[in-house]
């Protein structure tokens, strides 16, 4: 029967295991840094460290001789080296675990990244706000604030919004109101030159683009 070979990944776990022990003060009587600046450490009780490694991997027969053979794997790839002597000293040379982890989280004082001007999410969020404002404008108590509730305007005339020139009874459906505002926002952000044309021409363009918003027009 052939002996079970340890995979490179299993050996890499051994290296991580040792680093974990070094960072845990409760095991400082077993393994400790002899010079942390140079990443040199010493196993004060190497056989006990091997027993812990065996318990972690489900191998009760693990001993220091077997574990040290696993450590030799790292000598060949310049990841670990044995310090001369018989006091179980080793030195990390290059290990991914020792490399700093990238910071995926923005700092608190960093400015937030600007969202592109035109996006479906932005249009939907903006149209939901406008739909809510439209509902408030329909009540008698809020009629005096209707001029300030509209979010998009091309001119300062009373019919300055595409939503104003579309037959109001048709736009009782919130979905139609939302679609009208999305279209108006699209025109304002993607076709700003269209804002220079009279409102009736803008309305005609909208009728052609979205005829479902004008069910009463043939």
Curated annotation (Swiss-Prot):
GO MF term list: DNA-binding transcription factor activity, RNA polymerase II-specific; sequence-specific DNA binding
Function, as annotated: Probable transcription factor. Involved in responses to oxidative stress.
Name of this protein: ETS domain-containing protein ets-7
UniProtKB keywords: DNA-binding, Nucleus, Transcription, Transcription regulation
Biased composition, class Low complexity, residue ranges: 131-161
Induction per the UniProt record: Up-regulated by salicylamine.
Signal peptide limits: none
An annotated GO cellular component: nucleus
Gene field: ets-7
Coarse class of the protein's main subcellular location: nucleus
DNA-binding region, residue intervals: 12-93
Entry's family note: Belongs to the ETS family.
GO terms of biological process kind: cell differentiation; regulation of transcription by RNA polymerase II; response to oxidative stress
Residue ranges of the region described as Disordered: 131-162
Location relative to the cell: Nucleus
InterPro entries recorded: Ets_dom, ETS_fam, WH-like_DNA-bd_sf, WH_DNA-bd_sf
Domain of life: Eukaryota
């Amino acid at each position: 029967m052939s002996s079970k070979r340890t995979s490179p990944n299993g050996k890499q776990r051994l290296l991580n295991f040792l680093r974990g022990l070094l960072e845990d003060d409760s095991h400082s009587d077993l393994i400790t840094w002899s010079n942390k600046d140079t990443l040199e450490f010493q196993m004060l009780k190497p056989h006990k460290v091997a027993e812990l490694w065996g318990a972690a991997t489900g191998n009760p027969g693990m001993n220091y001789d077997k574990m040290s053979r696993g450590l030799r794997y790292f000598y060949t790839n310049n990841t670990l080296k044995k310090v001369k002597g018989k006091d179980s000293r080793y030195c990390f040379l290059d290990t991914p675990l020792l490399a700093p982890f990238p910071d995926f989280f923005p700092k608190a004082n960093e400015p937030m990244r600007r969202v592109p001007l035109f996006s479906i999410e932005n249009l939907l969020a903006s149209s939901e706000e406008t739909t809510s404002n439209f509902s408030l404008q329909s009540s008698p108590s809020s009629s005096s604030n209707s001029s300030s509730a509209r979010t998009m305007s091309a001119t300062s005339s009373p019919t300055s919004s595409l939503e104003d020139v579309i037959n109001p009874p048709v736009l009782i459906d919130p979905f139609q109101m939302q679609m009208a505002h999305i279209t108006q926002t699209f025109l304002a952000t993607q076709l700003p030159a269209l804002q220079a044309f009279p409102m009736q021409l803008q309305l005609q363009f909208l009728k052609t683009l979205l005829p479902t918003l004008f069910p009463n027009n043939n």
